[in-house]
């Protein structure tokens, strides 16, 4: 008897969950149907400014959780297809970066499924990250960022006490293990860990968000 009751309850819970999921999918579909593509017009959202020749933004293995990005504005509904950035060089093993877009006013992440990108060691890499879900940005202000999510465990162990190094030791390690980005002369956004708010800085690393402009249905 108890097994029958338990099975019945489980069946009801599954039915409720399925109904809620279907309702949410229907709502999402309706929201997407409320816009139409303006002739498939593609656009790049970028706020990078002028390249600073010879200048770099450097990440080291002790910067796990650190994010760097740019503030962007969408004037019309904008469907995100990919985020692009350039890496000058990488000498850190097994680097994983997380790519994110946040609503500027609340720092709420737009992606429900995080985007992770593995970066091999090497020079001059153009990285293209594509969302695994359909993302439609409503008109407003956003922050697009990349963060150092992870790297080789042995390397992290080597950097575990980096806050105790003197200047010479830090310089030696930084020249051996680093991830370098180009710098552009226009305000960017940085934060040391996900619990902090973003802060403005005078430069950015040239992130670009590519996609399609949409127009509200009248």
Segments predicted by a language model, with ranges:
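Short, surface-exposed linear segments at secondary-structure transitions and domain or protein termini
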Residues: 119-126, 167-172
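A glycine-anchored, Pro-Gly-centered beta-turn/N-cap motif
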Residues: 138-140
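Beta-sheet-rich sandwich/jelly-roll-like modules and their strand-loop junctions
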Residues: 29-104, 147-218
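Solvent-exposed serine/threonine-rich low-complexity stretches and specific carbohydrate-binding patches
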Residues: 109-121
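Bacterial Sec-dependent N-terminal signal peptides
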Residues: 1-26
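Exposed aromatic-hydrophobic patches
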Residues: 124-134
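Short, aromatic- and glycine-rich surface loops/edge beta-strands on solvent-exposed regions
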Residues: 142-146
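Long luminal/extracellular ectodomains of secretory-pathway precursor proteins
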Residues: 24-29, 37, 107, 120
